[in-house]
Amino acid sequence: MTTETLTTLEQHDRFLGRHIGPDSEQRQEMLNYVGAESLEDLTTQIVPESIRLNRDLAVGDNVSEAEGLAYIRQIADKNKVFKSYIGMGYYGTEVPSVIQRNVLENPGWYTAYTPYQPEIAQGRLEAILNFQQLSMDLTGLDLASSSLLDEATAAAEAMALAKRVSKAKKANIFFVADDVFPQTLDVIKTRAECFGMEVVVGPAEEAVNYELFGALFQYTNRYGQITDFTELFTALHEKKAIISVAADIMSLVMLKSPGSMGADVVFGNSQRFGVPMGFGGPHAAFFVSRDAHKRSLPGRIIGVSQDTRGNRALRMAMQTREQHIRREKANSNICTAQVLLANMASFYAVFHGPQGLKVIAERIHRLTDILAAGLTAKGVELVNNTWFDTLSIKGLDAKAVQKRADAAGINLRVDSCSESDGSSDQVLGVSLAETTTRTDVTQLFDVILGEGHGLDVAALDAQVMADSTSVPAELVRQDAILTHPTFNRYHSETEMMRYIKRLENKDLALNHSMISLGSCTMKLNAATEMMPITWPEFGNMHPFCPQDQAQGYAQLLGELSEWLVDITGYDAVSLQPNSGAQGEYAGLLAIKQYHESRGDAHRNICLIPSSAHGTNPASAQLAGMKIVVTACDKAGNIDMEDLKAKAAEVADNLSCIMVTYPSTHGVYEETIGEICEVIHQHGGQVYLDGANMNAQVGLTSPGFIGADVSHLNLHKTFAIPHGGGGPGMGPIGVKKHLAPFLSGHSVVKHGLESDGNGAVSAAPYGSAGILPITWMYIKLLGKQGLRESTQVALLNANYMMKKLSEHYPVLYTGRNDRVAHECIIDLRPLKEASGVTEMDIAKRLNDYGFHAPTMSFPVAGTLMIEPTESESKVELDRFIEAMVSIRAEAARVESGEWPVDNNPLHNAPHTLADIMDPEFDSRPYSREVAVFPTAAVKQNKFWPTVNRIDDVYGDRNLFCACVPISDYE
């Protein structure tokens, strides 16, 4: 019989032991190896005393997984899920169960990283390529990106693209039709102000009256009207304008494509293709342009290339456009986008196929026709005379209708519409969706007209079938869509399940092995944390629903904000930015507006260390700032003398510094407090990039250090999964003086001083639908668990660093020869001695069953390794064994035993086709060395499905659509 107390026994179900990889015995063994008595001793050795946080976090104690689920269930139950007819870019949809279970709830899909290592990412690359093909087919344009953050930010990117490529070089006006969604206009205005562009809003037909570089139109517009823009677009092209169209993805199944009308860019939200509304996100925006503008396209693009065997292989194409290479000259600061949601949308299209999508679109349209016929029969006046799914109604007693709608559990849209005489009239909007039924239409008649209307859906159906003019004949799509075999094969659940599984098997994710990407924090995304995001109480909430219906979300967002304020040491938090890059942008906007409020609009210079991530200069450029780069010293720290000199030199115009902490070199810089003081002395603000927050939580904080603003990557430090390239969340924390300058929103207001500020995202709380993950993470770990997680992250990194230092030089260390949560190993001496490159080692790790660490950042010719706290000593040792074995292989190249151009590193990764090839016998190493280099690999072999991919071939022969049908024959 046990002698332990009940309290001790109750602790056994706590989450901490599930989240942290090394158990107590493993931890002690690792501590002994690195030369520390305890986690506290190791923390003291690593974290500078001047920034050490000597208090507990105020986030409460940890709870069990069952308790956490019970708590969040109580919160979810406070949300009232009404039937939503609000529309405005967010609609009811049916998530096919085969996709929910096998993609959204599958760690093989949601724990993968952005496919920088394409040889072990062919599955999701194919799914993303399907998304691009879907986007191109529906829009009628040539080249699509893999996804953007949301429809409104896609609009801002379209404006930026138009400015880059328009031949109307002297023009500075971007025209926006006055019937676009208000949240889209909001984000455009925010971006335009930073770029110094003039936004003119007016009726669509007035666009020709301006000297402009670009214009934006909504198809269908916010009131539901469908317009043939062909003649208008022709006239605008004569003025050298670039034309962008915000389009509804479901309507494009039925309607003439914007590309065929002459649009240059088409974008929109793919949410209604099987992704829940989620109180605003996450959702994947599609973005498509003409081929002529390919070098200016924002976001990532998947292209077709070939591997060393000449076989078809997929990869990210034209990466030289992106922030991690082009920095402040990049097309966009977009990094993480919405790949998981793009994959869900693409699988939705694959599952339904063109005929299934047509049935869904025609059903939505038919029900809208029926609703319109019934209303007009009763004398109701419609604002629009054409429509796909949306009706705008005027002349009714809006309050009476709203009262009946509330009683019926229905949300309608209350809008305003400009009249020809300049006045404005209140209108009610109704947008139908895939989830709408004939019973719902009858209920809408009851709500809008009152009971006793006598309308019969079946009779109205017969009427509209015989005579419907809601879509003019010239606007009915005539061309075939989704003709590729992929969209016409997998319509049974069995076939769909197997297709998804076949793609999943090609990818390496956290459910197979550690992904030790430095600066990416690929930690556990626990199943219990993930569960609530699929609950309808969170998933089926419209972001613009009445606030009294979203009390559960209000509580969750409020508690999460309080916790993040405490963890960061700041005074206020904005949850609106829906990626880390957007967080940077929002934080810099707050700094910019703060200076302007003090009459210091001239302060526009941003100091950025040379070691910074590429998003930093890209975001600063986006905020209209000029970048001045500061040097780093030989130890990898910010060169204080250079910083002081440059801060003094630009003091009159200094806006801020962007600094990462711990540094991108993986150390706690001792001078961080002094850096903050120098910037403040010269009138600037300190932006502390939260990318490395996993080494701060519970030990120090940006606010305590002296920073003014930071973004937090919730998809790194706070357990939201990476999803193969998104979703992410990048909320920002600020000191009190910056709080009035946080992002506002034109649709949802909260009575705050920041309400009048521009938005950076389409939804007021960004991708609110995934915030329950972070809420659960903090709730389950509690104050002690969060701190201990950070400490174990330090332990794992230092254990790995010391083990690897016996075989590879470690580039940078901090006090007491320690690193923070990541370390950089220098491969340049090895390359010089043997000819083995960092690329060779990265690809060889695939043969050992590992994703490569971050390659050549922040220093070329290096690998940056971040194991996180979630990895056990067993997994760390397995990775270390692989790296040691690879070093031994490189030694055989160095000695001349293996040729530089014919060895297991140069030829990596190896596929089944390699070892089945009779010509393999001519290689100077065995098949076993190629694919089973250690005993551990035999126990858990991952097979890359393609050989090393030819990047140059892919960019020289750019092809970014599904491969031709002949490849399938």
Swiss-Prot record:
Enzyme class: oxidoreductase
Family per similarity comment: Belongs to the GcvP family.
Organism: Shewanella woodyi (strain ATCC 51908 / MS32)
Cofactor(s), names only, from the UniProt record: pyridoxal 5'-phosphate
SUPFAM superfamilies: PLP-dependent transferases (SSF53383)
Assembly and interaction partners: The glycine cleavage system is composed of four proteins: P, T, L and H.
Pfam families: GcvP2_C, GDC-P
Catalysed reactions listed for this entry: N(6)-[(R)-lipoyl]-L-lysyl-[glycine-cleavage complex H protein] + glycine + H(+) = N(6)-[(R)-S(8)-aminomethyldihydrolipoyl]-L-lysyl-[glycine-cleavage complex H protein] + CO2
Keyword annotations of the record: Oxidoreductase, Pyridoxal phosphate
UniProt name for this protein: Glycine dehydrogenase (decarboxylating)
One GO cellular component, as annotated: glycine cleavage complex
Organism ancestry: Bacteria, Pseudomonadati, Pseudomonadota, Gammaproteobacteria, Alteromonadales
NCBIfam families (alphabetical): gcvP (TIGR00461), PRK04366.1 (NF003346)
Gene field: gcvP
Signal sequence, start to end: none
EC number, as in UniProt: 1.4.4.2
